[in-house]
């Protein structure tokens, strides 16, 4: 039950692209980003990289330009959530194999829905009694009672939709007609049909036909939403420009306004401290940030500029850097010894002379397993992945400023700092890490500004 509700909520976010869309502007919307972040974090993490890779492969910039008339001069810079709209839309419109649909579909329709097929069919019958997927469907009184008492998905979705509309206005207006007014019903039908198609006892021919209809539905929503962004940019370009990029992303989006909001590990309080320490005049002077404010940066670029300002202008001490930086390491690294073993093993390959990379027989025993583990650096992974998806592979896009090897080394050393018992070694490694990151951030920030000019 909880899985189905969570799945529908995630579907609502991904398809309607409500958060940070520019089809309606409401300053209160920024609180939603944290709601969706938590929803997505609870989703199965092992599908995340696979889905991102398929989105990246499906994203054809030339196709986007041809179909949606993206400005050729490159002055239109989209926020990360808006890029997702175009990636989905281009994947659906340009790719004949609909890889993007397959990736999303697997997120919405899961084996966990198998045991609820009877109730899903019953729900579908309420809205589409003549649907071919439920021909000859019958339900016993006992089954009906269970569905009525324990399966009120629509009502719960309706309540969630009302909360959204209180903040955003009617969903169909907010998304320029891409989603109907009764979003709760639409997404319940989508998930119900998807589960019946995937797990129901129906003919292969009917299964294929109905899945194509679901693809068309998903494609239609994606393309309409992307076209809405293009039209809005052409008619109201100021809606996509930010006078103060730093404040826009960090004060309005990431820093909580509700004092009672959950703050795991004091993350937001540290973020506020970082924000307060940033010297904007220093950013303009050292990095020649455009003073007229008419240049908008995508969120990953803003992140890099902020980090660069922090390291260059404020002269933070090593301990503060360590506390801020290490907090972002992969959470599993704190809980599983196997990650330490894999980290040591991989770091030994990249940097055999590192004192942190003295591998043991236990580490060697994990060799095969380690090859399948991707250890990512969280504070870099979001800006780097988003930036790379937009402009090409990282080492090409940044002229070699940051390479995969550098990211891996920084990742591994950061994670290993949890495990190091030798205080002197820990201090030395932290200093080395701090110097490496500072240098790379400065170079990358300058390169971004040069690209904007």
Curated annotation (Swiss-Prot):
Tree of life domain: Eukaryota
GO CC terms, sorted: extracellular region
Tissue specificity: The 67 kDa protein is not tissue-specific. Thus, the puff Balbiani ring, which is tissue-specific, contains at least one non-tissue-specific gene.
Role, per record: Used by the larvae to construct a supramolecular structure, the larval tube.
Short name of any one Pfam family annotated for the protein: DUF5442
Keywords noted in UniProt: Secreted, Signal
Subcellular localization(s) per the UniProt record: Secreted
General remark: This ORF may only constitute one exon for the 67 kDa protein.
Protein name in the entry: Balbiani ring A 67 kDa protein
Signal peptide interval: 1-23
InterPro entries with a match to the protein in the record: DUF5442 (IPR035241)
